[in-house]
Structure formats: structure tokens, C-alpha cells
Amino acid sequence: VAQMAPGAAGDVAGAMVEANPDGAAEMAATVAENVPGAAGAIAGAIAEADPALAAEAAGAMMEANPAAASAAAAGMANAAPEVAGDVAGAMMEVAMDPEFATDFAENAATANPDLTPDQLDALVDNFAGNAVGAIAQGMAVGDPDIAGDMAGIMMDAAMANPDMAENFVGEIAGGMAAGAPQ
């Protein structure tokens, strides 16, 4: 549905979540991986249909396709701002997971065999920060009124890993500014 009729994807996803809430995270991951352009609509539909499923679905989307993070965060923040903090936390948990960065590096090396080890190291070093910035931007776009609160929540989550936190301050601020420049 997401590929053939993207405009209807959100409505269909909402109905699917209501019919089978246990499949929401798997559906979200599949869409993020295969039809990233529909990630925002699907994420918003899941959050609207059952806000309690939003964080798990957001984490699954982040794992499946980090490039869909901003759209997914925006969709969820717009549909259910009351769970935006949980959503951001779940997405940041994935972004900050060293195993996830390792998987990202392996996939990048396979897809780009001409990368030097230094270039690959730089990609991995920037991966988590870029992902966190995308999450922040998505949250701010989804609901500019919660941007300030979300920045604080995201910084608290970043402090769970103080070694990485210093890199996230600028990414969170930059993402929020890009998403809600007012």
C-alpha cells in the first residue's frame, strides 16, 4: 500500500495497528526499510492509533533505516506529542548503540568497497551524531511547540553515554534549529 498509494498509507497503517497492535513495530520497520518516503505517514498513524506503541515502532524504524529517522520522528511528534519524549529516547537508544554503529560500518564497507579505513572510521564516528541531529530536526518539524522540551529530554538521554554526549550537543541544537527556526 505504501508504495502503490502513499496517500492512503497512513489510514491503512492505522487500521492495521488497531487490528493487530503486536505487528506495529514490524510493519514500521518494513516500511522504513522499503518505502522510506512513507515513514512519516506510517509513524504518525501508529502514534495516533495507539500512542503506547510509538516508542517501540520508532526504535524499529530507526534500526531498519536511519535515513527515515527524521520523517518518522516528525510524524510521531505531530500525531502524538505526548509520547514524543519516549519516541526520541527509543530512537536515540538505537543511534547510540555501538553494535548498531558496527552494523552500519559493515554495511557501508560492503556498499562502498573503495572507502579507505580512515573514510570508514569517519563515517562511523559521524553516524550517531547525524542520526541524533535527524531525530531532533524531525521532532521540531513535527511539533515546533515542544522543541525546547524535546531538546532537554534528548540531552538527558545523551548523558546516558557521557563519552558521546559532547558530540550530541551541537547535533541536537542544530537539528532543533533546522526543524523549528522560529
Regions found by a protein language model. Name each.
Residues 1-182:
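General marker for long, soluble alpha-helical cores
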